[in-house]
Amino acid sequence: MKLSEIARRLGCTLDNCPDPDAVEITAVTGIEAAGPTDITFVSNPRYAAAAKTTHAGAIIVSDDFTAGRAPLVRSKNPYLTFAKAIELFYQAPKYAPGIHPTAVISPTAKVGANASIGPYVVIEDNVAIGANCVLRAHVVIYEGVTIGDNFFAHAHAVVREHCRIGNNVILQNGVVIGADGYGFARDTDGWYKIAQSGTTILDDNVEVQANSTVDRASIGETHIYADAKIDNLVMIGHGSSVGEHSLLCSQVGLAGSSHVGKNVILAGQVGVAGHLHIGDGVIAAGQTGVQNDIEPGKRIGGSPSYDHKQWIRSWQIQTRLPEIVKELRNLASKKSE
Protein backbone atom coordinates (compact mmCIF):
# COMPACT_ATOMS: atom_id res chain seq x y z
CA MET A 1 0.00 0.00 0.00
CA LYS A 2 1.35 3.43 -0.91
CA LEU A 3 2.23 5.71 1.99
CA SER A 4 0.00 8.41 0.56
CA GLU A 5 -2.99 6.04 0.80
CA ILE A 6 -2.08 5.02 4.35
CA ALA A 7 -1.93 8.67 5.45
CA ARG A 8 -5.27 9.36 3.79
CA ARG A 9 -6.99 6.43 5.49
CA LEU A 10 -5.52 7.30 8.89
CA GLY A 11 -6.36 11.00 8.56
CA CYS A 12 -2.72 12.02 9.10
CA THR A 13 -0.31 14.46 7.49
CA LEU A 14 3.07 13.54 6.02
CA ASP A 15 6.44 15.16 6.63
CA ASN A 16 9.96 14.48 5.40
CA CYS A 17 8.52 12.68 2.37
CA PRO A 18 8.72 14.46 -1.01
CA ASP A 19 7.03 11.62 -2.96
CA PRO A 20 4.64 9.54 -0.78
CA ASP A 21 3.35 7.70 -3.86
CA ALA A 22 6.81 6.20 -4.30
CA VAL A 23 6.92 4.71 -0.79
CA GLU A 24 5.39 1.22 -0.67
CA ILE A 25 4.46 -0.21 2.76
CA THR A 26 3.66 -3.89 3.28
CA ALA A 27 3.51 -4.34 7.08
CA VAL A 28 3.40 -2.72 10.52
CA THR A 29 6.46 -3.62 12.61
CA GLY A 30 8.24 -2.63 15.83
CA ILE A 31 10.80 0.12 15.44
CA GLU A 32 13.87 -2.02 16.07
CA ALA A 33 12.94 -4.66 13.49
CA ALA A 34 11.42 -2.38 10.85
CA GLY A 35 12.77 -2.39 7.30
CA PRO A 36 12.25 -0.22 4.21
CA THR A 37 8.76 -1.58 3.48
CA ASP A 38 7.51 -1.39 7.08
CA ILE A 39 5.70 1.36 8.95
CA THR A 40 6.40 1.71 12.67
CA PHE A 41 5.54 4.18 15.43
CA VAL A 42 6.93 6.17 18.35
CA SER A 43 4.68 7.06 21.28
CA ASN A 44 7.18 6.52 24.10
CA PRO A 45 10.07 9.01 24.47
CA ARG A 46 12.51 6.19 25.21
CA TYR A 47 12.34 5.18 21.53
CA ALA A 48 12.99 8.68 20.15
CA ALA A 49 16.67 7.94 19.50
CA ALA A 50 15.85 4.69 17.69
CA ALA A 51 13.41 6.58 15.48
CA LYS A 52 16.26 8.65 14.09
CA THR A 53 18.32 5.61 13.07
CA THR A 54 15.62 3.13 12.06
CA HIS A 55 15.47 1.66 8.57
CA ALA A 56 11.66 1.83 8.55
CA GLY A 57 9.88 3.04 5.46
CA ALA A 58 7.80 5.41 7.60
CA ILE A 59 7.20 6.28 11.27
CA ILE A 60 3.98 7.34 12.96
CA VAL A 61 4.93 10.18 15.31
CA SER A 62 3.42 13.07 17.27
CA ASP A 63 3.01 16.52 15.76
CA ASP A 64 6.05 17.87 17.61
CA PHE A 65 8.48 15.03 16.88
CA THR A 66 11.70 16.25 15.25
CA ALA A 67 12.55 14.81 11.87
CA GLY A 68 14.80 11.80 11.38
CA ARG A 69 15.79 9.98 8.21
CA ALA A 70 12.43 8.27 7.56
CA PRO A 71 9.18 9.75 6.27
CA LEU A 72 6.97 10.85 9.16
CA VAL A 73 3.24 10.22 9.53
CA ARG A 74 2.15 12.90 11.98
CA SER A 75 -0.68 12.18 14.41
CA LYS A 76 -2.13 13.76 17.53
CA ASN A 77 -2.32 10.25 19.04
CA PRO A 78 0.46 8.05 17.59
CA TYR A 79 -0.45 4.95 19.58
CA LEU A 80 -4.09 5.05 18.47
CA THR A 81 -3.00 5.67 14.89
CA PHE A 82 -0.63 2.69 15.13
CA ALA A 83 -3.55 0.52 16.29
CA LYS A 84 -5.61 1.62 13.28
CA ALA A 85 -2.65 1.09 10.93
CA ILE A 86 -2.48 -2.58 11.93
CA GLU A 87 -6.04 -3.03 10.68
CA LEU A 88 -4.97 -1.86 7.21
CA PHE A 89 -2.73 -4.92 6.86
CA TYR A 90 -4.14 -7.57 9.22
CA GLN A 91 -7.32 -9.45 8.44
CA ALA A 92 -8.86 -11.20 11.46
CA PRO A 93 -10.23 -14.71 10.85
CA LYS A 94 -13.76 -14.88 9.51
CA TYR A 95 -16.25 -17.39 10.89
CA ALA A 96 -19.02 -18.53 8.60
CA PRO A 97 -22.54 -18.66 10.05
CA GLY A 98 -23.70 -22.11 10.99
CA ILE A 99 -24.06 -24.60 13.84
CA HIS A 100 -21.60 -27.46 14.23
CA PRO A 101 -23.34 -30.85 14.46
CA THR A 102 -21.78 -31.58 17.87
CA ALA A 103 -23.23 -28.42 19.45
CA VAL A 104 -26.01 -28.93 22.02
CA ILE A 105 -28.61 -26.16 21.97
CA SER A 106 -31.77 -26.23 24.07
CA PRO A 107 -35.03 -25.96 22.12
CA THR A 108 -35.99 -23.07 24.41
CA ALA A 109 -32.84 -21.08 23.58
CA LYS A 110 -33.02 -18.21 21.09
CA VAL A 111 -29.96 -17.47 18.97
CA GLY A 112 -29.92 -14.47 16.61
CA ALA A 113 -29.15 -14.32 12.91
CA ASN A 114 -25.71 -15.09 11.45
CA ALA A 115 -24.53 -17.06 14.47
CA SER A 116 -21.37 -19.16 14.22
CA ILE A 117 -21.58 -22.00 16.76
CA GLY A 118 -18.48 -24.20 17.02
CA PRO A 119 -17.87 -27.83 18.07
CA TYR A 120 -19.22 -29.03 21.43
CA VAL A 121 -20.78 -25.70 22.35
CA VAL A 122 -23.55 -26.02 24.95
CA ILE A 123 -26.40 -23.50 25.17
CA GLU A 124 -28.88 -24.31 27.93
CA ASP A 125 -32.57 -23.54 28.51
CA ASN A 126 -34.04 -20.06 28.06
CA VAL A 127 -30.85 -18.45 26.80
CA ALA A 128 -31.22 -15.45 24.48
CA ILE A 129 -28.28 -14.44 22.27
CA GLY A 130 -28.34 -11.57 19.77
CA ALA A 131 -27.24 -11.42 16.15
CA ASN A 132 -23.77 -12.10 14.75
CA CYS A 133 -22.46 -14.08 17.71
CA VAL A 134 -19.39 -16.32 17.47
CA LEU A 135 -19.02 -19.15 19.98
CA ARG A 136 -15.86 -21.17 19.52
CA ALA A 137 -15.32 -24.78 20.59
CA HIS A 138 -16.46 -25.91 24.06
CA VAL A 139 -18.09 -22.62 25.04
CA VAL A 140 -20.83 -23.20 27.63
CA ILE A 141 -23.75 -20.83 28.23
CA TYR A 142 -25.81 -21.79 31.28
CA GLU A 143 -29.58 -21.41 31.59
CA GLY A 144 -31.33 -18.05 31.59
CA VAL A 145 -28.41 -16.01 30.23
CA THR A 146 -29.12 -12.99 28.02
CA ILE A 147 -26.47 -11.76 25.57
CA GLY A 148 -26.55 -8.87 23.09
CA ASP A 149 -25.38 -8.58 19.49
CA ASN A 150 -21.84 -9.25 18.20
CA PHE A 151 -20.84 -11.44 21.13
CA PHE A 152 -17.54 -13.32 20.67
CA ALA A 153 -16.56 -16.12 23.06
CA HIS A 154 -13.30 -17.96 22.45
CA ALA A 155 -12.79 -21.64 23.23
CA HIS A 156 -13.65 -22.86 26.74
CA ALA A 157 -15.27 -19.61 27.90
CA VAL A 158 -18.18 -20.13 30.31
CA VAL A 159 -21.11 -17.88 31.19
CA ARG A 160 -23.03 -19.10 34.23
CA GLU A 161 -26.76 -19.03 34.92
CA HIS A 162 -28.82 -15.83 34.61
CA CYS A 163 -25.89 -13.52 33.80
CA ARG A 164 -26.54 -10.53 31.52
CA ILE A 165 -24.12 -9.49 28.80
CA GLY A 166 -24.42 -6.47 26.50
CA ASN A 167 -23.43 -5.81 22.90
CA ASN A 168 -19.94 -6.22 21.39
CA VAL A 169 -18.56 -8.16 24.36
CA ILE A 170 -15.46 -10.34 23.90
CA LEU A 171 -14.51 -13.22 26.19
CA GLN A 172 -11.09 -14.72 25.58
CA ASN A 173 -10.15 -18.36 26.19
CA GLY A 174 -10.95 -19.84 29.58
CA VAL A 175 -12.92 -16.88 30.95
CA VAL A 176 -15.56 -17.71 33.55
CA ILE A 177 -18.38 -15.21 34.08
CA GLY A 178 -20.71 -15.70 37.04
CA ALA A 179 -19.08 -18.52 39.00
CA ASP A 180 -20.03 -18.70 42.67
CA GLY A 181 -18.55 -15.96 44.81
CA TYR A 182 -16.27 -16.95 47.67
CA GLY A 183 -18.80 -16.81 50.49
CA PHE A 184 -18.83 -18.96 53.64
CA ALA A 185 -20.24 -18.41 57.13
CA ARG A 186 -18.68 -19.96 60.24
CA ASP A 187 -20.79 -22.81 61.59
CA THR A 188 -20.34 -24.96 64.68
CA ASP A 189 -18.73 -27.73 62.67
CA GLY A 190 -16.94 -25.75 59.95
CA TRP A 191 -17.97 -23.46 57.13
CA TYR A 192 -21.50 -23.03 55.77
CA LYS A 193 -21.66 -22.19 52.06
CA ILE A 194 -23.58 -18.97 51.37
CA ALA A 195 -25.82 -19.34 48.34
CA GLN A 196 -24.67 -17.02 45.57
CA SER A 197 -28.12 -15.97 44.45
CA GLY A 198 -27.12 -12.79 42.62
CA THR A 199 -25.84 -12.28 39.10
CA THR A 200 -23.03 -10.84 36.99
CA ILE A 201 -23.56 -8.09 34.41
CA LEU A 202 -21.18 -7.10 31.61
CA ASP A 203 -22.19 -3.94 29.75
CA ASP A 204 -21.50 -3.05 26.10
CA ASN A 205 -17.94 -3.21 24.70
CA VAL A 206 -16.43 -5.02 27.68
CA GLU A 207 -13.51 -7.36 26.97
CA VAL A 208 -12.32 -9.99 29.44
CA GLN A 209 -9.06 -11.68 28.53
CA ALA A 210 -7.80 -15.22 29.03
CA ASN A 211 -8.42 -17.17 32.24
CA SER A 212 -9.98 -14.29 34.15
CA THR A 213 -12.99 -14.70 36.43
CA VAL A 214 -15.86 -12.41 37.39
CA ASP A 215 -17.82 -13.98 40.26
CA ARG A 216 -21.56 -13.66 40.77
CA ALA A 217 -22.86 -11.77 43.79
CA SER A 218 -24.33 -13.50 46.81
CA ILE A 219 -27.20 -11.00 46.57
CA GLY A 220 -27.50 -8.22 44.02
CA GLU A 221 -24.94 -8.03 41.23
CA THR A 222 -21.32 -7.93 40.20
CA HIS A 223 -21.17 -5.28 37.48
CA ILE A 224 -18.56 -4.51 34.81
CA TYR A 225 -19.58 -1.24 33.19
CA ALA A 226 -19.27 -0.24 29.52
CA ASP A 227 -15.89 -0.35 27.77
CA ALA A 228 -13.96 -1.70 30.76
CA LYS A 229 -11.05 -3.91 29.71
CA ILE A 230 -9.88 -6.78 31.93
CA ASP A 231 -6.51 -8.43 31.28
CA ASN A 232 -5.46 -12.08 31.67
CA LEU A 233 -5.58 -13.80 35.07
CA VAL A 234 -7.68 -11.14 36.81
CA MET A 235 -10.03 -12.12 39.65
CA ILE A 236 -13.08 -9.96 40.43
CA GLY A 237 -14.86 -10.91 43.63
CA HIS A 238 -18.59 -11.13 44.26
CA GLY A 239 -20.59 -7.93 44.51
CA SER A 240 -17.79 -5.78 43.09
CA SER A 241 -18.04 -3.26 40.26
CA VAL A 242 -15.66 -1.82 37.67
CA GLY A 243 -16.50 1.56 36.16
CA GLU A 244 -16.66 2.65 32.53
CA HIS A 245 -13.40 2.72 30.52
CA SER A 246 -11.31 1.30 33.37
CA LEU A 247 -8.31 -0.97 32.77
CA LEU A 248 -7.42 -3.88 35.06
CA CYS A 249 -4.04 -5.36 34.14
CA SER A 250 -2.85 -8.91 34.62
CA GLN A 251 -3.16 -10.57 38.04
CA VAL A 252 -5.22 -7.78 39.59
CA GLY A 253 -7.48 -9.04 42.36
CA LEU A 254 -10.60 -7.33 43.69
CA ALA A 255 -11.98 -8.73 46.94
CA GLY A 256 -15.74 -8.87 47.40
CA SER A 257 -17.81 -5.66 47.32
CA SER A 258 -14.92 -3.49 46.14
CA HIS A 259 -15.93 -0.73 43.74
CA VAL A 260 -13.66 0.75 41.07
CA GLY A 261 -14.66 4.05 39.46
CA LYS A 262 -14.50 5.27 35.86
CA ASN A 263 -11.24 5.63 33.90
CA VAL A 264 -9.22 3.85 36.58
CA ILE A 265 -5.97 2.01 35.76
CA LEU A 266 -4.87 -0.80 38.06
CA ALA A 267 -1.45 -2.04 36.92
CA GLY A 268 -0.27 -5.63 37.22
CA GLN A 269 -0.74 -7.51 40.50
CA VAL A 270 -2.65 -4.72 42.25
CA GLY A 271 -4.70 -6.09 45.13
CA VAL A 272 -7.81 -4.36 46.46
CA ALA A 273 -9.26 -5.29 49.85
CA GLY A 274 -12.99 -5.83 50.23
CA HIS A 275 -15.68 -3.17 50.70
CA LEU A 276 -13.51 -0.31 49.37
CA HIS A 277 -14.21 2.48 46.90
CA ILE A 278 -11.60 3.60 44.36
CA GLY A 279 -12.51 6.97 42.86
CA ASP A 280 -12.65 7.95 39.19
CA GLY A 281 -9.35 8.43 37.40
CA VAL A 282 -7.15 6.70 39.99
CA ILE A 283 -3.90 5.11 38.75
CA ALA A 284 -2.30 2.39 40.89
CA ALA A 285 1.27 1.25 40.19
CA GLY A 286 2.10 -2.43 39.85
CA GLN A 287 1.82 -4.56 43.02
CA THR A 288 0.03 -1.82 44.95
CA GLY A 289 -1.92 -3.11 47.94
CA VAL A 290 -5.07 -1.01 48.41
CA GLN A 291 -6.40 -1.17 51.98
CA ASN A 292 -8.36 2.10 52.20
CA ASP A 293 -10.77 4.10 50.06
CA ILE A 294 -8.94 6.16 47.39
CA GLU A 295 -10.08 9.65 46.40
CA PRO A 296 -10.69 10.44 42.70
CA GLY A 297 -7.67 11.36 40.60
CA LYS A 298 -5.03 10.00 42.97
CA ARG A 299 -1.85 8.21 41.84
CA ILE A 300 -0.79 5.57 44.33
CA GLY A 301 1.85 2.89 44.87
CA GLY A 302 3.25 0.62 47.55
CA SER A 303 1.71 -1.88 49.93
CA PRO A 304 -0.12 -0.61 51.86
CA SER A 305 -0.82 2.07 49.27
CA TYR A 306 0.07 5.74 49.59
CA ASP A 307 0.86 8.74 47.37
CA HIS A 308 2.83 7.70 44.28
CA LYS A 309 5.47 10.44 44.53
CA GLN A 310 6.09 9.66 48.19
CA TRP A 311 6.30 5.96 47.32
CA ILE A 312 8.94 6.68 44.66
CA ARG A 313 10.96 8.77 47.12
CA SER A 314 10.71 6.03 49.75
CA TRP A 315 11.85 3.43 47.24
CA GLN A 316 14.83 5.58 46.26
CA ILE A 317 15.81 5.93 49.92
CA GLN A 318 15.36 2.20 50.46
CA THR A 319 17.88 1.40 47.74
CA ARG A 320 20.42 3.56 49.62
CA LEU A 321 19.84 1.96 53.03
CA PRO A 322 23.14 0.00 53.13
CA GLU A 323 25.05 3.19 52.33
CA ILE A 324 23.07 5.19 54.91
CA VAL A 325 23.65 2.55 57.61
CA LYS A 326 27.37 2.61 56.88
CA GLU A 327 27.44 6.41 57.20
CA LEU A 328 25.54 6.29 60.49
CA ARG A 329 27.95 3.71 61.89
CA ASN A 330 30.89 5.88 60.89
CA LEU A 331 29.32 8.88 62.63
CA ALA A 332 28.61 6.81 65.75
CA SER A 333 32.20 5.55 65.76
CA LYS A 334 33.60 9.08 65.49
CA LYS A 335 31.31 10.30 68.27
CA SER A 336 32.51 7.54 70.62
CA GLU A 337 36.19 8.38 70.06
Swiss-Prot record:
Active site: which residues?
A: 238 (proton acceptor)
Q: Which SUPFAM superfamilies match?
A: Trimeric LpxA-like enzymes
The Enzyme Commission number assigned here is: 2.3.1.191
Its Gene Ontology cellular component terms are: membrane
Q: Keywords, A to Z?
A: Acyltransferase, Lipid A biosynthesis, Lipid biosynthesis, Lipid metabolism, Repeat, Transferase
GO BP field: lipid A biosynthetic process
Q: What class of enzyme is it?
A: transferase
Q: Which reaction does it catalyse?
A: a UDP-3-O-[(3R)-3-hydroxyacyl]-alpha-D-glucosamine + a (3R)-hydroxyacyl-[ACP] = a UDP-2-N,3-O-bis[(3R)-3-hydroxyacyl]-alpha-D-glucosamine + holo-[ACP] + H(+)
What GO molecular functions are on record for this protein? N-acyltransferase activity
Q: In which pathway does it act?
A: Bacterial outer membrane biogenesis; LPS lipid A biosynthesis
The protein's matches in CDD domains, at most eight in alphabetical order, are given as:
LbH_LpxD (cd03352)
General function of this protein? Catalyzes the N-acylation of UDP-3-O-acylglucosamine using 3-hydroxyacyl-ACP as the acyl donor. Is involved in the biosynthesis of lipid A, a phosphorylated glycolipid that anchors the lipopolysaccharide to the outer membrane of the cell.
Q: Which family does it belong to?
A: Belongs to the transferase hexapeptide repeat family. LpxD subfamily.
The subunit field of the Swiss-Prot or TrEMBL record says: Homotrimer.
Q: What is this protein called?
A: UDP-3-O-acylglucosamine N-acyltransferase 1
- Gene encoding it? lpxD1
